[in-house]
Amino acid sequence: MKSFLLNLKTNTPTIRWGMLKNETYFEGTIPEGYALAVCPSGNIVILDIDVKNGKNGYSNIPPNILGELIHTFWYETKSKGAHYWIEYTGKETLLNTSTKYGLDLRIGAKKGNAGGYVKYHHNVDIRQCKHLIKPSSNELNQWLETLFCGVNNN
């Protein structure tokens, strides 16, 4: 993983974040007008559930999947959505992409995919939360693969 600052006026990184080495973290107090962003790595993926712009991603998650997600590390976003951090145990290559369902996936850089990042809305350093990220079940893997393995869901 790695973390860096986002300029809130432009909603863009303050650095070329793709050039940061893995396990490089922003240290110190986040200045006014900025937010912390975190990019996952390895098999860690982040399911970004949106509740904004007329979309409610929660309405597109089966109850059994949501029941599994609540046991991994997660936090609410400012728009009342959430970021669920998952250790993906499947065999497929998931894509860093958004869908029309209010569900986005952020992955680390892999196989030509630059990866992505999320605004980190938690008050504890991500390094201290890694142990809370749970492995995915076969059922969750299949659901993620249906949404994020290259089928056009935009």
Name each model-derived stretch:
Residues 1-154:
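Conserved phosphate/metal-binding and DNA-contacting active-site motifs used
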